[in-house]
From Swiss-Prot:
EC number: 1.1.2.4
Name of the gene this protein is made from: DLD
Entry's induction text: By light.
Location of the transit peptide in the chain: 1-56
The name this protein goes by in its record: D-lactate dehydrogenase [cytochrome], mitochondrial
Species whose genome carries this gene: Arabidopsis thaliana
Disruption phenotype: No visible phenotype when grown under standard conditions, but developmental retardation and lethality when grown in presence of methylglyoxal or D-lactate.
Location(s), subcellular: Mitochondrion
Modes of activity regulation: Inhibited by cyanide ions.
Similarity field: Belongs to the FAD-binding oxidoreductase/transferase type 4 family.
Length: 567
């Protein structure tokens, strides 16, 4: 059966909709452990409206979510069903070989086995397959789509699915919230897409231990809604639709990483199903352990290439007693970056330090009718007691004034804080609104904090000289910054210019002992930079690990490890 609404899959104004689901569960208490038990008989809900701004931002790019005419043939019938004319060939640095892949027909015997395992939670419907095979939030091209989409409900089903696919050597592509921008959910070799959205239970909450055990399909926003009544929260904040499983797979972070760290710092243990069907527990629930290899960190950031995550134990934090949001303008991005560095060097425990350049502020003004000063802007969030946060705010105001800061504003009341923070939250939406019909190439470089001002200044000079609309958005407290490079996907010249700018920033970051990706992951888009960043020996070690755990190369093929190194 087809699970998704045909209405939302058609070429209509609603084509940006993503399925959003409620927790299919009812709470019950077991001492200090709170368990959400699944409601029997509940199945995947149809597509519904999302309240987040993120789908609206992506919807502004009409080409990002255009669907193929429903009369197009299935990929399993013809490998030319998707247009690959724009794919570029370019030696070992090209992802062309990975994007195209080698298509192999899925045996009928495997589909029969999967139907036995999953009953109705399986579909070969073209619309559903295309929806899962197309990159929802990125410019990366899809040349193949999955032949089958499956929706497991338990770890046992995941184990059986992987074991069956491994027997027939059929590729498996794990699928979470689909908010990744580096092509992580592409299916270059077709195969089976394993959608984890039905596995979204909160299995246990340990309030006194400040940890929670969840299934991979739950979103971080859903989880925090559940945790709020206990005075706890999970402190990572990537894209609104991101699922916990996908966040582990990509080793993501967000604007709060400067205070709470990244995903690798906030996961205590995992359960992972390996390609042969074995279920591996990576660690105990203890806050620290010296027992054996750190399998938890091996899986975090592996992007579905080693197995499928089925259970996550997360470290939680207390909801802060008080917070202050502050905003300040600067004459140059270097001045703003210098203040971010000086703030961190002062020892102040900020929870957020975000930088937006004047082009980004202009986009927000144009898109939302605001009248903000169009200058490089720093945004801070301070948390703690009321007295402590006010003291932090005053110290940072003094630091900013020494670096030509002006128009320093801060807010403590909830509505006022929300209004100030909307400046940052509306940034991506504003870019799409300012360049309708365009796609965004979003960069993700990160450098040691001492090099941030130099990198942003160097990049800003190159961006301003380009004919493309380019904005800067940085997590300035930890050296990570993004640029939104808007380009017309129908213009090869603009695409090449966007790629050139991306290359420039990545190679600049690498020259400063930085990385090509601070939080978005490698996927297909960043593979070409890994050898320069890590060295061939590191890539060969990754290959040996992959070969040992996944000898048939069925797990998310064409991702993470460059094609000239892999099988």
């Amino acid at each position: 059966m087809a699970f998704a609404s045909k209405f939302a899959r058609s070429k209509t104004i609603l084509s940006f909709l993503r399925p959003c689901r409620q927790l299919h569960s009812t709470p019950k208490s077991t001492g200090d452990v709170t368990v959400l038990s699944p409601v029997k008989g509940r199945r995947r809900l149809p597509t519904c409206w999302s309240s987040s701004l993120f789908p609206l931002a992506i919807a502004a790019s009409a080409t990002s979510f255009a669907y193929l005419n429903l009369s197009n043939p299935s990929i399993s019938e013809s490998s030319s069903a998707l247009d690959s004319r724009d794919i570029t060939v370019g030696g070992k640095d090209s992802t062309e070989a990975v994007v195209k892949g080698e298509y192999k027909q899925v045996p009928k015997e495997l589909i029969s086995q999967l139907k036995t395992i999953l009953e109705d939670n399986l579909t070969t419907d073209y619309d559903e397959r295309y929806f899962h095979g197309k990159p929802q939030n990125s410019f990366h091209k899809a040349v193949n789509i999955p032949d089958v989409v499956v929706f497991p409900r338990s770890e046992e089903e995941v184990s059986k699915i992987l074991k069956s696919c491994n027997e027939y050597k059929v590729p498996i592509v794990p699928y979470g919230g689909a908010t990744s921008i580096e092509g992580h959910t592409l299916a270059p070799k077709g195969g089976v897409c394993i959608d984890m959205s039905l596995m979204k239970r909160v299995k246990a909450l340990h309030v006194e231990d400040m940890d929670v055990i969840v299934e991979p399909g739950i979103g971080w926003l859903e989880l925090n809604e559940y945790l709020e009544e206990y005075g706890l929260f999970f402190p990572l904040d990537p894209g609104p639709g991101a699922s916990i499983g996908g966040m582990c797979a990509t080793r993501c972070s967000g604007s709060l990483a400067v205070r709470y760290g990244t995903m690798r710092d906030n996961v205590i243990s995992l359960k992972v199903v390996l390609p042969n069907g074995d279920v591996v527990k990576t660690a105990s629930r203890a806050r620290k352990s010296a027992a054996g290899y750190d399998l938890t960190r091996l899986i975090i950031g592996s992007e579905g290439t080693l197995g499928v995550i089925t259970e996550i134990t997360l470290r939680l934090q207390k909801i802060p007693q008080h917070s202050v949001v502050a905003v300040c303008n600067f004459p140059t991005v270097k001045d703003a970056a210098d203040v971010a560095i000086a703030t961190m060097m002062s020892g102040i425990q900020v929870s957020r330090v975000e930088l937006l350049d004047e082009v980004q502020i202009r986009a927000i003004n144009m898109a939302n009718g605001k009248n903000l000063t169009e200058a490089p802007t720093l945004m801070f969030e301070f948390i703690g007691t009321e007295a402590y946060t006010r003291e932090q705010t005053q110290i940072v105001q003094q630091i900013a004034s020494k670096h030509n800061g002006s128009d320093f504003m801060f807010a403590e009341e909830p509505e006022a804080k929300k209004e100030l923070w909307k400046i940052r939250k509306e940034a991506l939406w504003a870019c799409y609104a300012m360049a309708p019909g365009h796609e965004a190439m979003i960069t993700d470089v990160c450098v040691p904090l001492s090099h941030l001002a130099e990198l942003i200044s160097r990049s800003k000079k190159e961006l301003d000289a380009s004919s493309l609309l380019c904005t800067v958005i940085a997590h300035a407290g930890d050296g990570n910054f993004h640029t939104c490079i808007m380009f017309d996907p129908s213009s090869e010249e603009q695409r090449r210019e966007a790629e050139r700018l991306n290359h420039f920033m990545v190679h600049s970051a690498l020259s400063m002992d930085g990385t090509c990706t601070g939080e978005h992951g490698v996927g297909t888009g960043k593979m070409k930079y890994l050898e320069k960043e890590l060295g061939i020996e590191a890539l060969q070690t990754m290959k040996r690990i992959k070969k040992t755990l996944d000898p048939n190369d069925i797990m998310n093929p064409g991702k993470l490890i460059p094609p000239h190194v892999c099988f």
